[in-house]
Swiss-Prot record:
Protein name: Malate dehydrogenase
The family this protein is said to belong to: Belongs to the LDH/MDH superfamily. MDH type 1 family.
Chain residues that bind substrate: 81, 87, 119, 153
Keyword Ribosomal protein: no
Binding annotation for NAD(+): 7-13, 34, 94, 117-119, 227
Native source species: Shewanella oneidensis (strain ATCC 700550 / JCM 31522 / CIP 106686 / LMG 19005 / NCIMB 14063 / MR-1)
Keyword Transferase: no
Length: 311
């Protein structure tokens, strides 16, 4: 099993690489790529951790050496949010970065499962799909927008609010990965009920959690450590699916034939081909149905931005 992290010298990438070095199955290979010259050194640093995961780092303009033979590619390259920016402000820089990296993935490891972390995810996933279509290698079951951070935040905030063991909290988060497009299905959480006020405030907190971190770091960064953990959870689920483990389910932003939009975050069953099955997200409350329907114009606009960028 080989996993490649593109953008491995950044805040998310380093946290993700550390977690993968400690969690990947014995005998796995982990390859780190970043444009930054420090990247081989990050790999040397991590190589001192005593786990049976072979690690190599590559720097420079071309990610190809890191991608050869990759089964899973996780892309966190790009610029991070600063105070006053929203995820769409990142588009101008990150769109080109994702396009260039995916062009290399399409040539070097077209069958790899690709998880896009780089924001704005609603748009960068559409860019990746268009690039792969142009290259003639697009497989909608192998491309994912990583929305796991919305899920782990939901789990954490629900457990805090209701005094639950966070390990017992399970929730689907649907839609997209920014602002109003993030929709936690609180009505489905088992064993708890929320007042209308709690639903409204919790939904808003989950949607704005990224901004909460950006502001708390006072210009010193964005949500890198929690995103590293979220990306590791999703990456490990991809690996477990590839290894044939049964019933591996995660929410992800995918081209899953949704009635709502071309790309939509919802639960998917993972396996040897990536997405084995897109799962229904279940019954929703009136509040959730309204929130879902009113986000769709925003989501579709984000997707169109990505499609138009490549065309």
């Amino acid at each position: 099993m080989k996993v490649a992290v593109l953008g491995a010298a950044g805040g998310i990438g380093q946290a993700l690489a550390l977690l993968l070095k400690t969690q990947l199955p014995a005998g796995s290979k982990l390859s780190l790529y970043d444009i930054a010259p420090v990247t081989p050194g990050v790999a040397v640093d991590l190589s001192h951790i005593p786990t049976a995961v072979e690690i190599k780092g590559f720097a420079g303009e071309d990610p190809t050496p890191a991608l050869v033979g990759a089964d899973v590619v996780l892309i966190s390259a790009g610029v991070a949010r600063k105070p006053g920016m929203d995820r769409s402000d990142l588009f101008n820089i990150n769109a080109g970065i994702v396009r260039n990296l995916i062009e290399k993935v399409a040539v070097t490891c077209p069958k790899a499962l690709v998880g896009i972390i780089t924001n704005p995810v609603n748009t960068t996933v559409a860019i990746a799909a268009e690039v792969m279509k142009k290259a003639g290698v697009y497989d909608k079951n192998r491309l994912f927008g990583v929305t796991t951070l919305d899920v782990i935040r939901s789990e954490t905030f629900i457990a805090e609010l209701k005094g639950l063991n966070v390990a017992d909290v399970k929730i689907n988060v649907i839609g997209g990965h920014s602002g109003v497009t993030i929709l936690p299905l609180l009505s489905q959480v088992e064993g708890v009920t929320f007042s209308d006020e709690e639903v409204a405030s919790l939904t808003k907190r989950i949607q704005n959690a990224g901004t909460e971190v950006v502001e708390a770091k006072a210009g010193g960064g964005s949500a890198t450590l929690s995103m590293g953990q979220a990306a590791c959870r999703f990456g490990m689920s991809l690996v477990r699916g590839l290894q044939g483990e049964a019933n591996v389910v995660e929410c992800a932003y995918v081209d899953g034939g949704s009635e709502h939009a071309e790309f939509f975050a919802q639960p998917v069953l993972l396996g040897k081909n990536g997405i084995e099955k897109v799962l229904p997200y279940g019954e929703v409350s009136a509040f959730e149905a309204n929130a879902r329907d009113s986000m769709l114009d925003t989501l579709k606009g984000d997707i169109k931005l990505g499609v138009d960028f490549v065309k």
